[in-house]
């Protein structure tokens, strides 16, 4: 059978030691992360360790919570001729944000914005977003996406903090902002009879 260990109570050094021990014994190791490991994960230092010790590894892509949010909201996050950019970011909490990536600067584009790890600083998030998004911009607070107790709360940007606080939403909440939420307008040119492409000319 498999040996299963939770990394929640382990330091990075303890994780490395355990993985190397099993690797040196010729055993197969799976380091399982939530979501997709390339987004707000901790795989960079793990890859550096594997590289340093010549350990072969393979990364299997996962499904990020922002993708689960789009599915739960039954929304396409890019809308033809209206929104063509999705921003994945977070508010500034204990880990400082680079100056050029402050939330209010990113908000200038009024793109679809998916905000991770920021329910605890929702007042600050709302304040920064409202510097550029209209107060009535659609928002969604998506709690425990893909879990059995998943909950979705829709509203307007001006009520975002109220929505999060009144429903006691925690760190595992994805905040989505933008006109793409619930949008049913705009047609893709992909299937237009006037549009020629590789498979139809």
Residue spans for each PLM region:
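A short alpha->loop->secondary-structure connector
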Residues: 1, 51-54, 77, 131-136
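Class I S-adenosyl-L-methionine
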Residues: 1-60
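Class I SAM-dependent methyltransferase SAM-binding "motif I" and its flanking Rossmann-like core
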Residues: 36-109, 151-154
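Active-site donor-binding loop signature of nucleotide-sugar glycosyltransferases
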Residues: 7-9, 90-91, 144
């Amino acid at each position: 059978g498999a040996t299963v260990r939770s990394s929640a109570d382990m330091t990075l050094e303890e994780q490395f030691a355990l993985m190397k021990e099993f690797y040196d014994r010729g055993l197969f190791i799976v380091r399982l992360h939530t979501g997709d490991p390339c987004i707000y994960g901790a795989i960079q230092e793990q890859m550096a360790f594997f590289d340093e010790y010549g350990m072969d590894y393979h990364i299997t892509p996962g499904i990020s919570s922002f993708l689960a949010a789009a599915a739960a909201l039954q929304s396409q996050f890019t809308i033809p001729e209206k929104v063509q950019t999705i921003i994945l970011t977070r508010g500034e909490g204990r880990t400082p944000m680079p100056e050029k990536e402050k939330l209010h600067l990113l908000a200038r584009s009024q793109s679809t914005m998916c905000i991770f790890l920021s329910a605890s600083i929702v007042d600050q998030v709302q304040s920064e977003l409202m510097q550029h998004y209209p107060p009535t911009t659609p928002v969604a607070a998506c709690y425990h996406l893909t879990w059995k107790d998943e909950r979705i709360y829709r509203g307007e940007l001006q009520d975002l903090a109220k929505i999060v606080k009144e429903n006691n939403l925690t760190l595992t909440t994805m905040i989505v902002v933008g006109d793409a939420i619930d949008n049913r307008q705009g047609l893709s040119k992909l299937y237009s009879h006037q549009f020629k492409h590789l498979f139809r000319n």
